[in-house]
């Protein structure tokens, strides 16, 4: 019997500590998935709470046909694909909108708005904001495939299971999304070799258009996932060779662009679930009102977490 099975059985029997342990194993992944799917820190934090609540209230419906984390991914992806409260749901973006904004050169007319904040710090904030915003230019299907394959590096079978599609369909979605992202990056982004757009040049324009706030650096305030024992950061490529496998000299230009795009996004930091979201869930589990809402029963009754999935 695995530790996961033991924790699941205990959680279903009403053990709050076991339920907290289960959620602690997946909450960072849920938050990072929400970040990439929604594009802003506040929206990701709110959505993470909602996804974890769904996982709690649907726990009794988990058939254990996949790992607990894959099951939670499925809940998260379904929730995030239809999330309508976020910034980018209200103000959609596209690669055409991004490119028009870049070629307009509007940043040239904006004065220095950085104040006393270090401009290198602001440039890093803008890069993170821009790249996560860029993901929103992909449709929900392409974005989910791109995030799972490029950033989470899930096996195609696991990713397909989480998305509820075949591995073949998943690979096609991933390939299309990677090609579209690579095309845009190679044309416009300095990180991919183009001089059309550089974060350093667009800091003041980003402040003026409220892309970043110099007094509230959301991305810089997040805590990164700890490093693995060998010194590599968990969730990032172990080395240049593993991130870009294959003989560089024999690859086509198209494949190089795909690998460059994948490498840029794969190297983005992975973050801890914010304390506010984690504490909210912990307090909710311990709440008498919440237990009653999800079907808590008298002490001798088993399986209190039995709210049916709708």
Predicted feature locations:
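Structural recognition of an alpha-helix C-terminal capping motif at a helix-to-coil junction
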Residues: 32, 46-53, 57, 66-78
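Intrinsic, short, N-terminal disordered tails of RNA polymerase sigma-factor systems
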Residues: 1-9, 21, 88-144, 154-167, ...
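Sigma70-family region 2
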Residues: 12-13, 37-40, 50-67, 86-89
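C-terminal flanking helix
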Residues: 27, 31, 52, 80, ...
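Helix-turn-helix DNA-binding helix
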Residues: 44, 55, 170, 174-177
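Amphipathic, Lys/Arg- and hydrophobic-enriched alpha-helical face
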Residues: 23-41, 58, 84, 131, ...
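A short, charge-rich alpha-helical start-of-domain segment used by transcription regulators
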Residues: 9-31
């Amino acid at each position: 019997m695995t530790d996961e099975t033991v924790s699941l059985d205990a959680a279903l029997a009403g053990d709050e500590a076991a339920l907290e342990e289960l959620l602690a194993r997946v909450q960072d992944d849920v938050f990072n998935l929400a970040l990439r799917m929604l594009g802003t820190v506040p929206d990701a934090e709110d959505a993470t709470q909602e996804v974890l609540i769904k996982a709690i209230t649907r726990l009794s419906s988990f058939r254990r046909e996949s790992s607990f984390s894959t099951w939670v991914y499925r809940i998260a992806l379904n929730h995030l694909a239809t999330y309508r409260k976020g910034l980018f749901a209200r103000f959609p973006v596209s690669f055409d909108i991004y490119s028009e904004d870049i070629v307009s050169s509007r940043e040239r007319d904006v004065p220095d708005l950085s104040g006393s904040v270090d401009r290198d710090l602001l440039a890093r904030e803008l890069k993170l904001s821009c790249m996560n915003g860029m993901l929103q230019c992909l449709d929900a299907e392409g974005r989910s495939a791109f995030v799972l394959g490029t950033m989470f590096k899930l096996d195609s079978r696991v990713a397909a299971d989480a998305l509820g599609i075949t591995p073949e369909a998943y690979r096609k979605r991933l390939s299309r999304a990677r090609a579209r992202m690579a095309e845009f990056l190679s044309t416009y982004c300095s990180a991919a070799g183009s001089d059309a757009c550089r974060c350093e040049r667009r800091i003041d324009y980003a402040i003026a258009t409220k892309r970043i706030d110099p007094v509230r650096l959301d991305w810089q305030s997040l805590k990164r996932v700890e490093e693995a024992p060998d010194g590599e950061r968990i969730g990032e490529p172990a080395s240049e060779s593993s991130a870009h496998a294959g003989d560089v000299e024999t690859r086509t230009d198209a494949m190089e662009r795909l690998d460059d795009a994948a490498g840029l996004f794969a190297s983005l930091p992975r973050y801890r679930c914010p304390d506010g979201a984690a504490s909210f869930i912990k307090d909710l589990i311990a709440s008498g009102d919440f237990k009653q809402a999800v079907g808590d029963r008298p002490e001798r009754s088993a399986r209190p977490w039995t709210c049916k999935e709708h």
